[in-house]
Regions:
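The feature marks non-catalytic terminal segments
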Residues: 209-284
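Catalytic subdomain that performs nucleotidyl-dependent activation
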Residues: 76, 148-149, 156-233
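Residue-level detector of flexible, active-site-proximal loop/helix-junction positions
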Residues: 83-85, 114-116, 179, 195, ...
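Residue-level signal for secondary-structure boundary elements
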Residues: 38, 42, 171, 175, ...
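A structural signal for well-ordered alpha-helical scaffolds and beta->alpha junctions
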Residues: 23, 27, 93, 134, ...
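Short, basic, helix/turn surface patches
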Residues: 131-144, 178-184, 231, 235-251
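ATP-dependent adenylation/nucleotidyltransferase module used to activate substrates
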Residues: 2-162, 168-171, 198-206, 272-283
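Residues that form generic nucleotide/phosphate-binding pockets
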Residues: 29, 33, 166, 230-233, ...
């Protein structure tokens, strides 16, 4: 039965309009990233890593929406990795099972061991947990025959990682939207790379996505927290700072690619007395 709004009552239609507007806005960003980095092809089986947090649930929800209208016929599989060590966050899976069942998305729940290893090392528990979680995801993707592994990293994560690499390793590297692994057998993709965290928060609130409790208290190290503070400070004067950081790395990569290409040309003409073709182009 369709709901009937009373005269002057526009709350339901306003909420629905906001939901659809947000979904359309975020899907445009996802489609842009997918198109520019060729993330999806027909016949793909995509393993979506879900923790129950806002980022991974938004990713799963958007990919499911995209699947209904996309040109490529890809299969989605949700994967939830459960550590054997309690780290301060709840790990309920019943609501996630219901969510996936209602949408026809297969859900794989895999435990992985971390407690014994942490007892034998002084390494950061969050680092070791993340390492083992990713290893378990790779193994699950291989077992399930998945050729793509989707993570919920967003534009803020990409910018923060770039700043971390710049300040602490003196390298200009970012969290790439797509990375081929294991000689191309598996590709890690980040469809939310162009989506900002604040838009994810709005999306979750608008659609009422079921979420877990508080995130792991060890989930953000002090350096990343500092980079987040720096980024927010810069954004007060430069609202498009995250995109500027992303584009700066992109231009740097293109420049390096051109230089490598020119070096190949120079080597081909190494015995010639005249300037090589690459040098002539630089002089014009």
């Amino acid at each position: 039965m369709r709901a009937v709004n009373l005269p002057g009552d526009t709350s339901m239609t306003a909420d629905a309009a906001r939901q659809e507007k947000l979904a359309h806005y975020l899907l445009r960003a996802v489609n842009k990233a997918a198109r520019e980095h060729r993330m999806f092809s027909s016949g793909d089986t995509v393993l979506v890593a879900v923790s129950g947090g806002k980022d991974s649930m938004t990713l799963l929800d958007l990919l499911h929406r995209r699947q209904r209208a996309a040109k490529e016929s890809a299969t989605l599989v949700a994967a939830r990795m459960l550590p054997d060590r309690a780290c301060g966050r709840a790990v309920p899976v019943l609501w996630l099972e219901q969510y996936c069942q209602e949408r026809g998305i297969p859900l794989v729940t895999e435990p992985f061991e971390i407690a014994e290893e942490l007892a034998e090392t002084a390494a950061s528990p969050c680092f070791r947990c993340a390492w083992q979680r990713r290893k378990a995801l790779f193994q699950t993707a291989q077992r399930m025959g998945c050729n793509k592994l989707a993570f919920g990293h967003h534009a803020d994560d990409v910018a923060e990682t770039t700043l971390l690499n710049l300040f602490y390793t003196a390298t200009i590297r970012r969290m790439e939207p797509q990375v081929a692994l294991f000689q191309g057998a598996l590709a890690v993709i980040r469809p939310l790379a162009y989506v900002e965290e604040r838009d994810i928060v709005d999306y979750v609130k608008a659609w009422g996505l079921p979420l877990e409790g508080e995130p792991c208290p060890e989930g953000m190290d002090s350096r990343r927290r500092l980079m987040r503070q720096v980024l927010r400070l810069v954004e007060q004067d430069c609202p498009k700072a995250k995109r500027a950081i992303y584009n700066a790395v992109e231009r740097n990569q293109l420049t390096l690619r051109d230089l490598r290409s020119e070096l190949v040309e120079c080597r081909k003409q190494i015995a010639a007395l005249d300037p090589c073709a690459a040098a002539e182009r630089r002089q014009t």
